[in-house]
Every structure is written in structure tokens, then in C-alpha cells.
């Protein structure tokens, strides 16, 4: 069937900011889809609120709108652009929910916009739990015993019939938001009321728990002619009960018999045919390990996290083909881009094993609730490819960057066996490593199986890994055993530990005896057809399939899994760097291990190596490819941390030299440079022990800010006010980075300013200066950034420009540099310098039209900025005002305090742009999920030091008609100024504030941190309650002030004459 000619313009809705449950996989899917539609000749209009993505680059669509993903804003774009059609299935749950709202409000009908791809009725049938269950009953496909509830009372009625445990699944949410497993009445009450709150339809499915069944997924495609294929089937190692995004996944499935595989395949195809899916779809099934009984769990009628994984696992570009199916093309007329000869109707076959392991944020949130269930907690994931299951698992483990490189914990031998078993009996993010530890201690596989329900097949594989460890110990230095361990994915580091050698000695031993990996191609067809994809993985076999060309090569290190502090912004820079390398005539090679991102799409680079980002794995590739050099400044801290290790092997680091990278991080050298170029910084010292830190603080004066050197995202950074807090910190944090000392700095409260610049060794260009709304002390990734600065004087701007140029030249930067300044006591001070690409590069690149990562890469290759047409200094300002607002995923993480501070907590960001600061802020806040209302009720409870400042704020909110609730201390302060406030009780008292929040009486909460155990606990409870009830909670008065400005701009003030 030819494609549709009756439509010309297509609107694509993106997925918005990165949150837990909806990460970079939609940047990848959306980018592929937009390019595919343009390739077919359609005019593409994209709306997405996330500036950090490749998808929102001007080249990807004909028109790009970076606007909040709300009904009203998208409706305006539809009225303005008059698209013929809307494609909703590539923007995750956000895109789907938006399409449903636009349909129900009549906007699509009024503007004659058709929906492409899967029909709305089918989407609703898959997403609405009641309609889905009805269809399954009609098809005779078993679903777990379940009931749909709209109230907590109904949930208790169902519990009386079936008993515990129960699984709660809210409708129309993603990442299992609001859901969970209930074992008793208290949990049932809490989880169901939460779930009803988060479900746009106020509807939850309660089902009898089938925890312990195998969880199997099929990624399927179907077109309008009813051609349907399975692209990939996957098996979760964790049984049903853990969200698939938090499960360790293997592809293809390993423990299904052919009968089981075909049975579940037939069911998956039968269901998507009945639903009338057109495009990609993910089917999740539960299989009883002891019989042929199965249940269907759910169907995602859209491109999902699993489809990104399936695309990278097979090389089959699901999103690209789904977009083409949506405009009428069919599978039997589209070529598979990997082979270029077979059609898209051929089901991929794999001659390798894929392992995916989720990346959790608990290294950032040590107090977070680690137990895993049906609500997702991982921020990202890694994938690894091997010839055996053991090899792919161990490669995935060392890709995670937890400081773990094997099946065990660094301090594993220090735990006693009872504690280890206790940890295994609970499902959490470290269970896999504790299983390895238990097997080492001789625990039987039967006992582990009874505690975890993990299939014996996988437990035997774990046992095999431990057996090889013992063999290495018994045959130290034996080459046969070394080779054997390499076949099963062991790292040099692990072998060195067992051989009683250093990692370097094992590496040399391998080199001398020619024990090196070869690289195999990912070709979708197990080498049945000729294939030309430049997509490789390493394994220890004989035949190398990676053909080395004569062209000069540059190797770019990617940034690994998405985590807090290192998000999709670094992938954005990586992709742009690769494009610049290709334009300059070099061969561009990427090494990365994140299946969700654009950089690991095989069509981006000349060669993609899907490998762990470790010294050993990267050196193996360098030894084969012999590149001109390696680029580390676009891959975040992951890549920067490898620079030293690679340089020791004689590898050339391109761009800013290693010596200068270290100068920016080394305290004493950096201070010497600042003195030389005459740039001030807050007074500070370094400490290697608690005693030294206390002496430093006494000299500098409290408050001080303390942090380990060489970290990203403000990990383990804190502001402390006295000796006791400092001692506490030093005993906890010196762990954070033992080889590197702790920095103790005077904490200056003032305006924080962020600057990104590019330097070629001679000229420094500054695309933009950004001012933070929150005072210094809130991590830059969690602050609202404003461009251009709104409150700085000409003198301050000139000083910032001058200092930036001095710093870039003083550090001999070649490429990008990011600098944070504070303006305090009438002076500009430098807070920190990062000699690499930063979180704000995509944001500034979009605003100014200066392709920063590409210019930096060209400078690294040796081109001059003046030859590219740029003059030194700050570049001309773009028109309008732009804000970057952070987005948090606190509703997915229990027990995490949401107070903003020097440690980063946000998972993503949105951009707001308009003609005034207030309008841009309105969009930024709306896009980040803060509903800005022109009237309502605000609850204020602030620390003593903030009481004076909060008076002015209360006055302004009162004048625009906001009602004020306050705790007694704050209310008394307001009464002094005749500001009416209703007093609410402290926690546990009469008319207590938590009840008021839970009852929906409050629209905004302003709560600032008070030190001291009891009040800290209260404050923590207040903040968690607001998050769990979906109410904006502002922990910085600067953010509250900005919000008040927006409210004032939307309304009229009422003052008596």
C-alpha cells in the first residue's frame, strides 16, 4: 500500500522532561520518527518541553515548539499551525494522555486533525483497565482475578473476596506511578488512595498477586494490512511483582521451551490484532513456572522503554518503522535498514545474549526506600551484549558505574550470612550482588530459589561465575584459566584479584599472549543475510568482524546510563560532537552502553561499539582501531574519569590536556592559577581528616560548604553550620572519595551565575550568561536558570565576561568550559570550573542558535573560532526571555527529602520562553508540573532565619487574593504586620497541617529547612506529604518569590484606598 497523500503536515507530541519511568528512550524514538516522516516527504511539527534532547533540534522537524505539554498550549499550536494529523504514540504516556484530552475536548475535531497510527479507541482499550479486561475475556485470554475500583471502600470489598497480597495498578499512568503491592489493610488504604490521586481517570485495577510467575515481554509490530511480527522477546530475571523497568532483563528469553515460546507469541499477536494496533506495541505476560498456565498483565499501545531496548538488542528500528506504518506503509514494502536487502517482515534472530540492568539513584539518595515493587525507581539502564549469559551479565554489571565490577559487593566479605540472606529475601536494587555473595558462602541454589523465585537456569549461571572465581584462585597465573574466564566476561580487575596480581599485570599478560577480544556485528539475522551495520560488541572468540579502514579516526566516549547529575544533556553533546567529526572528514567512533539514547543508534556514528565504559574495555577498542585520539569532554564525569587511565597507556586525549583537566580539579593548583590571573574565590581549604576540617572551619568561619573533589551532580556536598555537623559529615563523606581530599569553603549567600564558554586556545566565545533564581547553595542543576540575566549591572556583566576569558585561557581550554560564579558582598567570586561539556549546553545552543558542542569539537580538531565567524567575548543576546526549570521524580522515591541544597536531585528539565520573564517562568513552572493558579490557599511554615523575608511574600500573595495558612511561629510574625493568616496545628495536633494538605485545602506549600532532629522530622513529613498529594512544595524563598511574580502578572492586586 502506498503512503497516504491526503495529509501533508503532521504534529508529533514529545514526552517532555526526563522523569523516572520516562527517560531518554523517547528522545531516541521521537528523533527517529520525525526523521522518518521527513524522509517520506511530510512536513513535521514537533512540540516538546525538553530542551536537553536531540529531538528538539531545529534539524529534526520542520518546526519545533519548545512549550509546556499541556492541553491549552498544544491546542494553541494546533490552531496556529493547522496540522492535518497528529501522531501521539511516540511521546510515551505523556503523548498518549495529551491526545486523549485533545480528542475529548473537541480540539482535534474542531480543527480537522486526524489521529495517526493506532486508533484512539484501541489506545483506550489497552489503557483503560476495565475495557482491557472485557476484551481479554472476549478473546479467552486469561487475566489475573481483578476488580476496577474508583474508591478506597471498593478496594476493601474486593480484598474481602480474594485476600492478600494484592497488586494495585492505576489507569493511564506510566512507570507504575501510584501503584504497589499490598500485604495488609494499612498498605491497601495508602496505595489505593495514592493510585486514585495519580490516575487521570481516578481508576485503579486491583488484581490478585501472581508474584513469583515468570515475567515475559514480547515487542511486536503490526501494520494496517494485518502483517504482524515479533521483533524481540525478553525475559525478566526477577519474577512478576517488580516493575519491568526495574528488573534485570535478558533477550532472547532463556528459560522458555519452544512450546511456551510459541504459545505466548501467538497470544501476543492475537491481542494486538484484536486491539487493532498499528505500529509498535509491548505485551507483558506472566507464565507459571510449573505449568502452561499464563496471564496477560498489560499491553502498552505505543513505543516504550522496552521497544528502545528491543531496537538496540536486535538492531531493528522500531520507532522509525512505526512512524512509517502510521502514514500507511506496510511491513512487506519497507526494507530492514540494517541488512538493506531483507524486508521488515523478517523477524530478527539473535546469535548473542543481551542483558539489561537498571541504574538506580540510591547512591544519591542513601535514605531512599530501596525495596522494589510495581512502581518504577530506576533513572536509567545499561545494556551489554555477549556470547554467553555470564559474559553479557558481567559486562552489564561493570557498565553501571556503582564502583562494582563483578557479581559481588566491594565489602562483601564483611557481611555475615544471616544479613546476606535477609537482604536476598527482599527485592531491592542490590539483591543480585548479595546472591553472588551467598553462593560464595556455600548457600544452596534451592534455598536462594525459595527466597527469590528466580529460575534455576539463572542461578546456575551465577554459580558458574563463582566456580570460575575459585578455579582462578587455584590456578594463579595459568593462561588456560585466564582465557576461560575471559570467555565468560570476567574483567582484568576481577582476574587480578584472584590471581593476586595488579590489573596492569593481567593486561600485560594478555597482550604478551595475544589474548584479545574480537568484535562481532549486530545484524538482526544471525549472519543469514549480508549486512553492513557498523554496530559491534566485543567477545573472546576467533573471527573479528570489525573491518578497520585507512581513514583517520576519532573516538568519542559516551556518558553511560542516565542518572541524577548526568542526564540526556551529555548524550546530546556526544551526538553533536560526532556530527562535527564526520563533517571534518574523520571517521567517528562511539563507545557507549546506554540502550535508551540517540548516540547508540547505529546510524549516528561511522562505528558504534556497545561496550562498558571502563579502562579495559575502551583500551581493547583503541588497540584495534588505533584512533588519532580520544575525546572525553562530552561524556560527563564518566568520560572525564577515564582520561587519566587512558593517558597512562599512551592514548592521546584530544582537547583540553589532561594536565589542565587536573589543574581545574586540584585545589592547590587551581588556587595558584586564580592568584596568578587575579580572579577571587570564596576562602577555602582542603582537609584529609576530621581534625584538619575542624581547624579549617575555625579559621574560615561558619557556615562552610564541604564536598569531595572530582564528583558530578554535587554528590555528598553539604552546607554545615557548626562543629558537630562538620564532624558528622567528615566521618560519613571521607568515604565518598578516599583518594581525594575534602574541600572546605566559606559559604557565600548571593546570586549564582552560570557561564558556558568555548575556547580554541586563542579566542574565547561566551554564547550566554545565565542567572539562577535560587541563591548560591542550591545545586545549579536544581535551580531555575534565566537567560539573559535580569538583575545584573553592566559592571557585573563585564566582570563575568573578563573572568571567564581569563579562566579559559589560564587553563588552556580547548573545547568547552562551564563556570559557576557567585555575586556577594559587591564582588564576583568563582565557585567552580568544569573543563567539559555541561548540563546547560543544549539549552544555550537552542536559544542562541550557536551549535556549541559542534564548535567545541571543531576547535578540538584544530579549527579557529575566528575562522568560523565568531568574535571573542559574550555573543549577541537572543530575543526574548528563556528559563530552564528543573523537574523532579520525588513521587516515585519514598523517604527522600525534597529540600533543595548543594546535592542535585532533579532528573530532568523543561524550557519556558516568552517575551517577559513572568511569561517565560509561567511556562517553565507549568511545564515542570507546578500548576500556577491566580487564587487559592498557600501554607507557610518557615525557619526563624526566613521569617523576616517571608513577610513581604505573604503581603503580596494576600493582595492578589491568596488565603494564607501558617504554623503558629510564622503566623505570629505575619500578625505583627497585620497580614491575616489562619493558624494550623503542628503535626499530630488539632487542625493539623498534614490533614489540611491531604484534604486538598492547600494549593502551594512554602517550607524552609530548620535544623534540629524533631523539627527536621516534622519538616520532612510536611514535604513528603505535599509530594504524595501532588502539591508544589517550595523549599527556597527565591523560587516562591518567582512564583509570586508570575501570579501577580496574571491577576490584579486589590488594595484599599
Swiss-Prot record:
Q: Where is this region: Carboxyphosphate synthetic domain?
A: 1-401
Q: Which cofactor does it need?
A: Mg(2+); Mn(2+)
What are the binding positions for Mg(2+) 4 in this chain?
832, 834
Return the annotated region ranges for Allosteric domain: 930-1057
Binding site residues for Mg(2+) 1 = 284, 298
Please verify whether the record's keywords include Transit peptide: no
Binding residues for Mg(2+) 2: 298, 300
> Subunit info?
Composed of two chains; the small (or glutamine) chain promotes the hydrolysis of glutamine to ammonia, which is used by the large (or ammonia) chain to synthesize carbamoyl phosphate. Tetramer of heterodimers (alpha,beta)4.
Functionally, this protein is described as follows:
Large subunit of the glutamine-dependent carbamoyl phosphate synthetase (CPSase). CPSase catalyzes the formation of carbamoyl phosphate from the ammonia moiety of glutamine, carbonate, and phosphate donated by ATP, constituting the first step of 2 biosynthetic pathways, one leading to arginine and/or urea and the other to pyrimidine nucleotides.
| HAMAP family with a match to the protein in the record | CPSase_L_chain_A, CPSase_L_chain_B
Please report the name of this protein according to its UniProt entry: Carbamoyl phosphate synthase large chain
What organism does the UniProt record list as the source?
Staphylococcus aureus (strain bovine RF122 / ET3-1)
Amino acid at each position: 500500500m502506498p503512503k497516504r497523500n491526503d495529509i501533508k503536515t503532521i504534529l508529533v507530541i514529545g514526552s517532555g522532561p526526563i522523569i523516572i519511568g520516562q527517560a531518554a528512550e523517547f528522545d531516541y524514538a521521537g528523533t527517529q520518527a520525525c526523521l522518518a516522516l521527513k524522509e517520506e516527504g511530510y512536513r513535521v511539527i514537533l512540540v516538546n518541553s525538553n530542551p536537553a534532547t536531540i529531538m528538539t533540534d531545529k534539524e529534526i522537524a520542520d518546526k519545533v515548539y519548545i512549550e509546556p505539554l499541556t492541553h491549552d498550549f498544544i491546542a494553541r499550536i494546533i490552531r496556529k499551525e493547522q496540522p492535518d494529523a497528529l501522531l501521539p504514540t511516540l511521546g510515551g504516556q505523556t503523548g498518549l494522555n495529551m491526545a486523549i484530552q485533545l480528542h475529548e475536548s473537541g480540539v482535534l475535531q474542531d480543527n480537522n486533525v486526524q489521529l495517526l497510527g493506532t486508533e484512539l479507541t484501541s489506545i483506550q482499550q489497552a489503557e483503560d483497565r476495565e475495557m482491557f479486561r472485557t476484551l481479554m475475556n472476549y478473546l479467552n485470554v486469561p487475566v489475573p482475578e481483578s476488580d476496577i475500583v474508583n474508591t478506597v471502600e471498593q478496594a476493601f470489598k474486593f480484598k474481602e473476596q480474594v485476600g492478600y497480597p494484592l497488586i494495585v495498578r492505576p489507569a493511564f499512568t506510566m512507570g507504575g506511578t501510584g501503584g504497589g503491592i499490598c500485604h495488609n489493610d494499612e498498605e491497601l488504604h495508602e496505595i489505593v488512595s495514592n493510585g486514585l490521586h495519580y490516575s487521570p481517570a481516578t481508576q485503579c485495577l486491583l488484581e490478585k498477586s501472581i508474584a513469583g510467575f515468570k515475567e515475559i515481554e514480547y515487542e511486536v509490530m503490526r501494520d494496517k494490512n494485518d502483517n504482524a511480527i515479533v521483533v524481540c522477546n525478553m525475559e525478566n530475571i526477577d519474577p512478576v511483582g517488580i516493575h519491568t523497568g526495574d528488573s534485570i532483563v535478558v533477550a532472547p528469553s532463556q528459560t522458555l521451551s519452544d512450546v511456551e515460546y510459541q504459545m505466548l507469541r501467538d497470544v501476543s499477536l492475537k491481542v494486538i490484532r484484536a486491539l487493532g494496533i498499528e505500529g509498535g506495541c509491548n505485551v507483558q505476560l506472566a507464565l507459571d513456572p510449573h505449568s502452561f498456565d499464563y496471564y496477560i498483565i498489560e499491553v502498552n499501545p505505543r513505543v516504550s522503554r522496552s521497544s528502545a531496548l528491543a531496537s538496540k538488542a536486535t538492531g531493528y528500528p522500531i520507532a522509525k518503522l512505526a512512524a512509517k506504518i502510521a502514514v500507511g506503509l506496510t511491513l512487506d514494502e519497507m526494507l530492514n535498514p540494517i541488512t538493506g536487502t531483507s524486508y521488515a517482515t523478517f523477524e530478527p534472530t539473535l546469535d548473542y545474549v543481551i542483558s539489561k540492568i537498571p541504574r538506580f539513584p540510591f547512591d544519591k539518595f542513601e535514605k531512599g526506600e530501596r525495596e522494589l515493587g510495581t512502581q518504577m525507581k530506576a533513572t536509567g539502564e545499561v545494556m551489554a551484549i555477549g556470547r554467553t549469559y555470564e559474559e553479557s551479565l558481567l559486562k552489564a554489571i561493570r557498565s553501571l558505574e556503582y564502583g562494582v565490577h563483578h557479581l559481588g559487593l566491594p565489602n562483601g566479605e564483611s557481611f555475615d550470612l544471616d544479613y546476606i540472606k535477609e537482604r536476598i529475601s527482599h527485592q531491592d536494587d542490590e539483591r543480585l550482588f548479595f546472591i553472588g555473595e551467598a553462593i560464595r558462602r556455600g548457600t544452596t541454589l534451592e534455598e536462594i530459589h525459595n527466597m527469590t523465585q528466580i529460575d534455576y537456569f539463572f542461578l546456575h549461571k551465577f554459580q558458574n561465575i563463582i566456580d570460575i572465581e575459585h578455579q582462578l584462585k587455584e590456578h594463579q597465573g595459568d593462561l588456560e584459566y585466564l582465557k576461560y574466564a575471559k570467555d565468560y566476561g570476567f574483567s582484568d580487575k576481577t582476574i587480578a584479584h584472584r590471581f593476586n596480581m595488579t590489573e596492569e599485570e593481567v593486561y600485560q599478560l594478555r597482550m604478551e599472549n595475544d589474548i584479545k577480544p574480537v568484535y562481532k556485528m549486530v545484524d538482526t539475522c544471525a549472519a543469514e543475510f549480508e549486512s553492513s551495520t557498523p554496530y559491534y560488541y566485543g567477545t573472546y572468540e576467533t573471527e573479528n568482524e570489525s573491518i578497520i579502514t585507512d581513514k583517520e579516526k576519532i573516538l568519542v566516549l559516551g556518558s553511560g546510563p542516565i542518572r541524577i547529575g548526568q542526564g540526556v544533556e551529555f548524550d546530546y553533546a556526544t551526538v553533536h560532537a560526532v556530527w562535527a567529526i564526520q563533517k571534518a572528514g574523520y571517521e567517528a567512533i562511539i563507545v557507549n552502553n546506554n540502550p535508551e539514547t540517540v548516540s547508540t543508534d547505529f546510524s549516528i556514528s561511522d562505528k558504534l561499539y556497545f561496550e562498558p565504559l571502563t579502562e579495559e574495555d575502551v583500551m581493547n577498542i583503541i588497540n584495534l582501531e588505533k584512533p588519532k585520539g580520544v575525546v572525553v569532554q562530552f561524556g560527563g564525569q564518566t568520560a572525564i574519569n577515564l582520561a587519566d587511565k587512558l593517558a597512562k597507556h599512551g592514548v592521546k586525549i584530544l582537547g583540553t590536556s589532561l594536565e589542565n583537566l587536573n589543574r581545574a580539579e586540584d585545589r592547590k593548583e587551581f588556587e595558584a592559577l586564580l592568584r596568578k590571573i587575579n580572579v577571587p574565590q570564596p576562602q577555602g581549604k582542603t582537609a584529609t581528616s576530621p581534625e584538619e576540617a575542624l581547624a579549617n572551619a575555625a579559621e574560615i568561619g561558619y557556615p562552610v560548604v564541604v564536598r569531595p573533589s572530582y564528583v558530578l551532580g554535587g554528590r555528598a556536598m553539604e552546607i554545615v553550620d557548626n562543629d558537630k555537623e562538620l564532624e558528622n559529615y567528615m566521618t560519613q563523606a571521607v568515604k565518598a572519595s578516599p583518594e581525594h581530599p575534602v574541600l572546605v569553603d566559606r559559604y557565600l549567600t548571593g546570586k549564582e551565575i552560570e557561564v558556558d564558554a568555548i575556547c580554541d586556545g586563542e579566542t574565547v566565545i561566551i554564547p550566554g550568561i545565565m542567572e539562577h533564581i535560587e541563591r548560591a547553595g542550591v545545586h545549579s542543576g536544581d535551580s531555575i536558570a534565566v537567560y539573559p540575566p535580569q538583575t545584573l549591572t553592566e559592571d557585573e556583566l563585564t566582570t563575568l565576561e573578563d573572568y571567564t576569558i581569563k579562566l579559559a585561557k589560564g587553563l588552556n581550554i580547548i573545547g568547552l568550559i562551564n563556570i559557576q560564579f557567585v555575586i556577594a558582598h559587591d564582588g564576583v567570586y568563582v565557585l567552580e570550573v568544569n573543563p567539559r561539556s555541561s548540563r546547560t549546553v543544549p539549552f544555550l545552543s537552542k536559544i542562541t542558535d550557536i551549535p556549541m558542542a559542534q564548535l567545541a569539537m571543531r576547535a578540538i580538531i584544530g579549527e579557529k573560532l575566528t575562522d568560523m565567524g565568531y568574535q571573542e567575548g559574550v555573543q549577541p543576546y537572543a530575543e526574548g526571555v528563556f528559563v530552564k526549570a528543573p523537574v523532579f521524580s520525588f513521587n516515585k522515591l519514598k523517604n527522600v527529602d525534597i529540600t533543595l541544597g548543594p546535592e542535585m536531585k532533579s532528573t530532568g528539565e523543561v524550557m519556558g520562553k516568552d517575551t517577559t520573564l513572568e511569561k517565560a517562568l509561567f511556562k517553565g513552572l507549568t511545564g515542570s508540573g507546578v500548576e500556577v493558579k491566580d487564587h487559592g490557599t498557600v501554607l507557610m511554615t518557615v525557619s526563624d532565619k526566613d521569617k523576616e523575608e517571608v513577610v513581604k511574600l505573604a503581603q503580596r500573595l494576600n493582595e492578589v487574593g491568596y488565603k494564607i495558612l501558617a504554623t503558629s511561629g510564622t503566623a505570629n510574625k505575619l500578625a505583627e504586620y497585620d497580614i491575616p493568616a489562619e493558624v494550623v496545628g503542628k503535626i499530630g495536633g488539632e487542625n493539623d497541617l498534614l490533614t489540611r494538605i491531604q484534604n486538598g485545602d492547600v494549593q502551594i506549600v512554602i517550607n524552609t529547612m530548620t535544623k534540629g532532629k524533631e523539627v527536621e522530622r516534622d519538616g520532612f513529613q510536611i514535604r513528603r506529604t505535599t509530594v504524595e498529594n501532588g502539591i508544589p512544595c517550595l523549599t527556597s524563598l527565591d523560587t516562591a518569590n518567582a512564583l509570586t511574580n508570575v501570579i501577580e502578572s496574571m491577576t490584579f492586586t486589590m488594595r484599599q484606598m
